[in-house]
Amino acid sequence: MKKLTICSEYTPSGDQPTAIKQLLEGIESGLAHQTLLGVTGSGKTYTIANVIEKLNRPTMMLAPNKTLAAQLYGEMKEFFPDNAVEYFVSYYDYYQPEAYVPTTDTFIEKDASVNEHIEQMRLSATKALLERRDVIIIASVSAIYGLGDPDSYLKMMLHISRGDIINQRDILRRLAELQYTRNDVAFARATYRVRGDVIDIFPAESDRLALRVELFDEEIERISQFDPLTGQVERTLDRVTVYPKTHYATPKEKIIAAVDKIKIELKHRSQQLKDNNKLVEEQRLTQRTQFDIEMMTELGYCSGIENYSRYLSGREEGGAPPTLFDYLPDDGLLIIDESHVTVPQIGAMYKGDRSRKENLVEYGFRLPSALDNRPMKFEEFEAISPQTIYVSATPSKFELEKCGSDIAEQVVRPTGLLDPEIEVRPVETQVDDLLSEINKRLPLDERVLATTLTKRMAEDLTDYLYDHGIKARYLHSDVDTVERVEIIRDFRLGKFDVLVGINLLREGLDMPEVSLVAILDADKEGFLRSDRSLIQTIGRAARNLNGRAILYGDRITGSMRRAIDETERRRVKQHQYNLDNNITPQGVVRRITDVMGVGSYSDAKSLDKVAEANTNYHINQQAEEPLLTTSQIDTKIVELEKLMQGHAQNLEFEQAAAMRDKIAKLRIQQLST
């Protein structure tokens, strides 16, 4: 059995050895809750990695959002390259839940766009938990939402061993039950193809390798893993397990039992609605439910099958839904990163979901059992959680009350860096002042973070900076998951110099290149400008030797005062430690990696992303267009217009937009010649 083993050139230093020892002693003595209070840049992730290695238990790390989950995933994959580090976040790029608005009599159908890459990673995560112990799962709060029942999921697996006697048609029937589709032309994830006595299966949880099962008559003669692109066989296997396409795959007998219970509930609910003279609602509910029952009986699933999860998983009314936590072994370890944000999120999910579903039930769109398709309640989360370590630079009241004195403090950084210096400046000239500060840092190849209060302000500030020759982009909740990771990677690579955000430029973002954090409208009290938010945002500059923070405000609020005082307290302690140990502060150098496998760094031709509206720039000076004569410009514009029309006809709109931007640039050049 493989052990969790760190591969790193670093050794614990500063406050890290003390924190590691304290956390390990707490876990081994049976403490249910502990807190690691570590300042930004003090190496909290490395401390936790050491704790995980020493304990050697399956571990789940919860992050407050997808951006931080992706960063944690990248760091843990670096620390544990030989172990199973998996990623489990919501697989929706876009999600509109079904809802009913009684005031306008509007029903909104469920609409969603699933990211296949993330869906594959989710399936890979549960597979790793079921098959091995050297597992670290990096998850978002998506982990508390209902997932397929692990017992049903295990029963659905298809086990194939060399030498088994099995009919080819039986294998194909089982693959259909696992919701795999036959496709002899386009071989993709969760499909299979048949060529004579050879069955090729592309597992749903695999991102690269497919399976080949070769039969001789009715005996399985050979099982191999191969590259579906080249056809090259990687290795032969004695046995293999094929996992279902979805976590909601359910054995036929369970579906039949569930359908019987759904019919009983439908009959009871229909009578209730009739008795209350709600005939429209009764007719609507009967029609929708009967359709779902037919689909489940014939195909084994239906659209919105999760709304019948109470019956499919055999739970009692009001029982906690099966979640990712049910796949985690009993001796697992839970790490809640940036706990001051993550814990409140866990508590908030249930109530928002409940209010929407109550309308659907009341107006006949769903059976009352649909209320049990929900995220866990906070008390259910607490009951199922294994031993927990909360990680935060600014723990909230909840963590402090839960842990009491069981808090490991990590204030001194291994690099000797101090917290950033803080300066308060007036709001009136904040944008122009920020522009001048940015221009000071450009020659030094340093980056700048600016935080605003609204999305509109972030976009307007980005446009303003761009108009003044600054390469800037914005990052907020409208930017999709994978693109956020790409934006942060491009920022660190120097493809642009200023990143403008609202609430995403806070916890955990690890960008050592940032030397200035500018907080606009810092004197506007609220959750975006609370002392915790300010400390977290200021901390983004704590990994740079020249780190500074500018708070723009006409007055010093209570939150600003607390943030400034806490930062100063830490600076004094850090400075004293450096003096006592003769340490010279050193800037952090961190390799830039493509954690999600979504892009290439040297891709000078890569397309500008949507968040970069009306913007087109390249960092590579050699890649810039040479100056052309007027006739050359005319010829070039005609060529680009043809390309643009071609891309548009092929529905390649991003490429067409890139051509449009090049044409606009040439027209400007044309006017200036």
UniProtKB/Swiss-Prot annotation:
Residues in Helicase ATP-binding domain copies: 25-413
Source lineage: Bacteria, Pseudomonadati, Pseudomonadota, Gammaproteobacteria, Alteromonadales
Gene Ontology annotations for the cellular component aspect, listed alphabetically: cytoplasm; excinuclease repair complex
Database matches in PANTHER family: UVRABC SYSTEM PROTEIN B
GO BP, sorted A to Z: nucleotide-excision repair; SOS response
Matching HAMAP family: UvrB
Assembly description: Forms a heterotetramer with UvrA during the search for lesions. Interacts with UvrC in an incision complex.
NCBIfam families per record: PRK05298.1, uvrb
Native source species: Colwellia psychrerythraea (strain 34H / ATCC BAA-681)
Motif Beta-hairpin in this chain: 91-114
Ligand binding (ATP): G38, V39, T40, G41, S42, G43, K44, T45
The UniProt record lists the keyword DNA damage: yes
One protein family per Pfam: UVR
Gene3D superfamilies recorded: 6.10.140.240, P-loop containing nucleotide triphosphate hydrolases, UVR domain
The record's note on its domains: The beta-hairpin motif is involved in DNA binding.
Domain annotation Helicase C-terminal: ranges: 430-583
Summary of the function given for this chain in its UniProt record: The UvrABC repair system catalyzes the recognition and processing of DNA lesions. A damage recognition complex composed of 2 UvrA and 2 UvrB subunits scans DNA for abnormalities. Upon binding of the UvrA(2)B(2) complex to a putative damaged site, the DNA wraps around one UvrB monomer. DNA wrap is dependent on ATP binding by UvrB and probably causes local melting of the DNA helix, facilitating insertion of UvrB beta-hairpin between the DNA strands. Then UvrB probes one DNA strand for the presence of a lesion.
Family: Belongs to the UvrB family.
GO MF annotation list: ATP binding; ATP hydrolysis activity; DNA binding; excinuclease ABC activity
Residues annotated as domain UVR: 634-669
Protein known as: UvrABC system protein B
Subcellular location: Cytoplasm
Keywords: ATP-binding, Cytoplasm, DNA damage, DNA excision, DNA repair, Excision nuclease, Nucleotide-binding, SOS response
